[in-house]
A protein has these predicted regions:
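N-terminal strand-loop element at the rim of the active site
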Residues: 7-12, 26-75
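Nucleotide-activated donor-binding/catalytic signature segment of Leloir-type glycosyltransferases, i.e.
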Residues: 237-255
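Conserved acidic donor-binding segment of nucleotide-sugar-dependent glycosyltransferases
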Residues: 308-309, 313-320, 329-334
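Acidic donor-binding loop of glycosyltransferase active sites
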Residues: 265-279, 292
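Carbohydrate-associated surface elements
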Residues: 41, 152, 171
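Short hydrophobic beta-strand element within catalytic cores of glycosyltransferases
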Residues: 293-296, 306
Length: 380
């Protein structure tokens, strides 16, 4: 099968959607299929370590839902997408975030292949979906199949564009995150390491973790907070750091992908206090795959991944007192940390990329058979 995978996002900046696409592509190729990834990029192809990548357009940073999306807005690139689709004649065109400009919408408009769209985002209010509904409702009919990575993600888009959405979650590279790698020796000094991984964006809730940390640091001086992720601190987090003179807080910035498993293994507790805007909890699964117990906000996207008390601990969002209490309970009870880590690691096995990719491929086959009854007869 010949498959085109369309991303709206800058391929030079790793993120959840691009990682999803790369892993799907790798799995499909291991099954014997041919894949082509189409995305904008801010770097030359030769620097991007993706041998099946076609770059269309230069991305620019666009504020979006409390984050920054690096997408191309040049409508002239639509003609290049049209030409590529005509030349390649894909069996399947899989469009990620199919209602975003410019590449996904161009693929949605011009593709004559079987078109599948995956909706990744969770936004409580999507002004773009609402404002452009009179136009997009006609284009979305060009999708023969729709996937959402979680029920919350499906619920948001279905509010504006009703229909069936096949729930197929994000996957995780278990071989990478479950690897038996050593923790970082410099942090193996008897302190309790609390880890945060995420962009320095307000919606990631770091300010609430810093506030919770300030509540427990004086009772438990042996705790340390490790913060991994790119970006600049928001004003609220800066204020907490300045006013409370917090000790043993290390900002590590963006770290190499290959080092992430070691940070998870170094951590005694992983904490993700996001306030919303999460359709799924990839970082939660990464931590669980590494055997690290998780404390996270009880928001829709995270609650689809964690059952409170079974695979981790959920606390009310934006509640630093509740977060501090959960941290204290875990700090005091090493047996709870161990048990949650073991259960989380076992649970994460269900999200392996080979299983997720197989589900996506089965969906392709189902849609192809519905579109072409002769294909069903040929398979039987």
């Amino acid at each position: 099968m010949k498959i085109g995978l369309i991303s709206p996002y800058d391929w030079a900046h790793p993120g959840g959607v691009n990682t999803h696409i790369r892993c799907l592509s790798d799995q499909f190729r291991s099954m014997g299929h041919r894949t082509t990834i189409v995305a904008p990029a801010s770097k030359p192809v030769a620097e991007l370590d993706t041998d099946n990548l076609v770059v269309i357009g230069k991305p620019i940073p666009v504020p979006m839902a409390g984050s920054v999306a690096r997408i191309t807005l040049s409508v002239h690139r639509a003609r290049r997408v049209k030409s590529l689709l005509e030349d390649e004649e894909f069996d399947v065109v899989h469009i990620h975030e199919p209602l975003l400009p410019v590449l996904p919408l161009a693929a949605l408009r011009f593709s004559r292949s079987l078109n599948v769209g995956t909706f990744h985002a969770y936004l409580r209010r999507n002004r773009g979906y609402r404002a452009l509904r009179p136009i997009l409702k006609n284009w979305i009919r060009n999708l023969h199949g729709k996937i959402a990575v979680s029920e919350p993600a499906a619920g948001i888009v279905a509010r504006y564009y009703p229909g069936y959405y096949n729930i197929i979650p994000n996957g995780i590279d278990l071989a990478h995150f479950s690897a038996d790698v050593p923790p970082f020796e410099k942090y193996n000094d008897g302190k309790i390491n609390i880890l945060f991984v995420g962009r320095m964006e307000k919606r990631k809730g770091l300010q609430y973790l810093l506030a919770a940390y300030s509540r427990i640091k004086w009772e438990f001086p042996q705790v340390r907070l490790l913060i991994v992720g790119p970006g600049k601190l928001d004003a609220a987090s800066e204020r907490i750091l300045g006013e409370r003179l917090l000790e043993d807080v290390e900002f590590l910035g963006q770290v190499p992908y290959d080092d992430l498993p070691r940070y998870y293994r170094t951590a005694d507790i992983f904490c993700s206090p996001a306030t919303g805007g999460e359709s799924f909890g990839i970082v939660l699964l990464e931590a669980m795959a590494a055997g690290t117990p998780v404390i996270a906000s009880d928001i829709p996207g995270y609650a689809t991944v964690i059952e409170d008390g079974a695979h981790g601990v959920l606390v009310p969002p934006k509640d630093d007192a509740a977060l501090a209490n959960a941290l204290v309970e875990m700090i005091r009870r090493p047996d709870t940390r161990r048990d949650l880590g073991q259960r989380g690691r076992a649970y994460a096995q269900a999200f392996s990329w080979d299983l997720v990719a197989r589900r996506v491929m089965d969906y392709y086959e189902q849609l192809l058979q519905e579109r072409d009854p002769l294909r069903r007869l040929q398979k039987t």
